Every structure is written in structure tokens, then in C-alpha cells.
Amino acid sequence: MKIFARLFFTLLFMGHAMAQETPQTQLPRIALSAGIHQMDIQVALTPEQHQIGLMYRSEMPQNEGMLFVFQAPSKQCFWMKNTILPLTAAFVADDGSIVNLEDMKPQTTDSHCSLKPVRYVLEMNQGWFAKKGLKAGSKLAGRPFNN
């Protein structure tokens, strides 16, 4: 019986460890836009989804990203632990306006923070916002923004 219990807990632990190193790809999706630029966005709503974010992904299509939705506006800080892709984080106000943009280097624990309290953070491939001419003050449209 002891052997069975040890085997069970070993397999349980291994399954949990493996699940943590798998990219989350089955999150709900929404469409966002910035002027003429369309985005296909996965939405991370829970603390667990926030924690995993875009970790462990080796690629992401050009117009895809992830929107992190928090319960209330507050200072948001992100890092890139276990994240392979270089990303840009847009810290976004409730009305969809970009507060600030932060380029984030893969596999680092440097903090990248909003300049003021925000409820939303949109991560896209690094350089996506710059290539589209988007900067602080630019507006995003679509659910959940109030526009």
C-alpha cells in the first residue's frame, strides 16, 4: 500500500509540474482594434491565468496578444520569468487609452510597471505598437473598454 501511495503522489506531483510548464492557449478571445489595426486577443481573468500569462510560448501570431483584466485599477507590474517571446506591455485605462508602453526582455525578472493605476494590460509581440504608430494616449476599442 505504501508503494501505491508513493507512486500516486509522485505521479500527481509530476502532472502538476508538467501542467505549469505548458502554455495556456484555451482562454476566451475577443477582438480589439486600434484605429484600422485589428487584434485577436486572449483574455486572462483569474489570478492563475494572470500568473501564467504568455509563459512557455515559443511563438505568437503577429496580431494576437493577451489582455490581463484586473478587478479594479491599481499600479500593475509585470515581469518575464519563463517567457520566451520578447513582448511589449501596454498599460491601458478603463476608456481604452494607453497610459504607457514597456518593452520587456525575455527570461528576466525586471519589473515593468504602469505609470498610474490601470485595470488592463495588453501584451503583444515586441515592436507591434511601434510598427502601428501607437503610443501613450492612443486609444484601443472594443469590449471591455468604455468607448
List each model region and its residues.
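Sec-dependent signal peptide recognition
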Residues: K2-T10
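Hydrophobic h-region of N-terminal signal peptides that target proteins for export
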Residues: T10-A19
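Compact, glycine-rich, soluble single-domain proteins
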Residues: Q20-N147
